[in-house]
Amino acid sequence: MSFSRLPLALAFGLITSLGAHADILNKPVSLKTEGDLVQAVSTTLQHAVAMSEQYRGTEPRLQRFARNEINARRKPIEQLNKIGRIQPMPVKQLSVTPTDDAAYLNAMLRNHAWLIELIEFGRSLPLSSNTKRLIDTLSRDATAELAALGKLEQR
């Protein structure tokens, strides 16, 4: 990149980050311990639930997906919060409300891809057997849901 374009690139990056700061998935994450992983995964799941609760679209398949997402994520969030001895964050305040079907679909694709990435990286950490079991289950579920979302995106 030439130095003449540097100010433009910095300004664009600043504008982009200011517009996206409200979404919790844009916050930096440091995964150094099992507790960090548990916190990050719990927050990502809470984000998915908050987005699904706020979704008011018209697509029946996405409505069904949102209901299933809410029901499927409650128990793992509770388990993660118990394992990590953490208090749930007010994620509803930190997620961007989906404005339509496409926005919700994109938000869920992003959320699930981020969840899978967190889990894959987190597997390199020393994990207790309970956490490892829960993380493995979440990984399988998130991968299957990401595939289902991908099919919905193609329609």
Question: What is each stretch, according to the model?
Answer:
Residues 9-17:
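Bacterial N-terminal signal peptides
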Residues 3-4, 19-155:
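His/Met- and acidic-residue-enriched segments that coordinate or traffic transition-metal cofactors
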